[in-house]
Amino acid sequence: MDRKIYVLGSGHNHPEHPDVVRCDILPGHGVDMVFDLDVIPWPIADGAAMEVNASHIMEHLKNPCRFMDELWRITYPGGQVYIETPDAANFDLAWCDPTHKRPFRLHTFLNYFTVIGVHRLPTVKHGWEF
C-alpha cells in the first residue's frame, strides 16, 4: 500500500504534493477528497496514512472521541498524528469562534491516549503573548 500524508480540514492552504491528500468538507481548489469528518467511517482505508495532520479541526466536531478513533484506524502502526487545537485555558482563543463546539486541554488527549494504550507521546505547547 502506498501510504500518504492526510491533511484534514485543509481548505486551500496546502500546496499540492504527490504524497499529500488534502481533505475538506467543501470542494474547492486544492482539495483532493471531500467528506464530513463527523460522518464515520471516513472514506480512507485502514492504515492508509503514514501521517495525519489535524490543525484546528477537533474544536468544530460533534464527537471528538469518534474522530480520534478514526485517526487511529487510518494511521498505520508507527505512523504519526499531529493535532492542534486552541487551549481551553485561553478563554478568548477557545471560544472566540462561534463554530467552536468545545475547548480542549492537554490532559484531554493524554487521558484518551492512555485508554487506547499509547503511553508515551511527545507534546508541544505554544502560546502567543502580546
Per-region residue spans from a language model:
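S-adenosyl-L-methionine-dependent methyltransferase catalytic module, highlighting the catalytic core
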Residues: 65-72, 76, 80-130
